[in-house]
C-alpha cells in the first residue's frame, strides 16, 4: 500500500511536465548532467594528482620531520614556569 505503481509515477511525471514545461525540464536535465560530468572530471583529476603526492611523501619519509616555529606562537608551559619562578 505504501509503494507506488508505474501508473502513479506516470501521472506524477505528466503533472510535472504540465507545470514546468518540457523545455525547462530539458534545461534542468542538461544542467544536472553537466554537473555530474564536472564532478567526475574533478574526481579523475584528484586521483591523477594523488600518485604524485605519494611520491613526495615517500621521499620525505626518509628525512626526519622538521619542527616549525612561528614567532607568534607562545609556549604555555614556558610562560607558566616563568610566572611561578
Swiss-Prot record:
Where is the protein found, in the record's own terms? Cell inner membrane
Q: Which Gene3D superfamilies match?
A: 1.20.5.3310
Identify the main location: membrane
Listed GO MF terms: protein transmembrane transporter activity
| Residues that span the membrane, as ranges | 1-21
Bias regions of kind Basic and acidic residues — which residues?
39-51, 66-85
The protein's topology relative to the membrane is: Single-pass membrane protein
Q: Which residues fall in a compositionally biased region of kind Low complexity? A: 52-65
- Pfam family example for this protein? TatA_B_E
- Which InterPro entries would you find in this protein's record? TatA/B/E (IPR003369), TatA/E (IPR006312)
Q: Which GO terms describe its biological process?
A: protein transport by the Tat complex
Segments of this protein annotated with the region Disordered: 39-85
Its Gene Ontology cellular component terms are: TAT protein transport complex
Which keywords accompany this UniProt record? Answer: Cell inner membrane, Cell membrane, Membrane, Protein transport, Translocation, Transmembrane, Transmembrane helix, Transport
What is known about what this protein does? Part of the twin-arginine translocation (Tat) system that transports large folded proteins containing a characteristic twin-arginine motif in their signal peptide across membranes. TatA could form the protein-conducting channel of the Tat system.
Q: Which family does it belong to?
A: Belongs to the TatA/E family.
Assembly mode: The Tat system comprises two distinct complexes: a TatABC complex, containing multiple copies of TatA, TatB and TatC subunits, and a separate TatA complex, containing only TatA subunits. Substrates initially bind to the TatABC complex, which probably triggers association of the separate TatA complex to form the active translocon.
Q: Which PANTHER family match?
A: SEC-INDEPENDENT PROTEIN TRANSLOCASE PROTEIN TATA (PTHR42982:SF1)
Name of the molecule in the record? Sec-independent protein translocase protein TatA
Q: Which organism encodes this protein?
A: Ralstonia nicotianae (strain ATCC BAA-1114 / GMI1000)
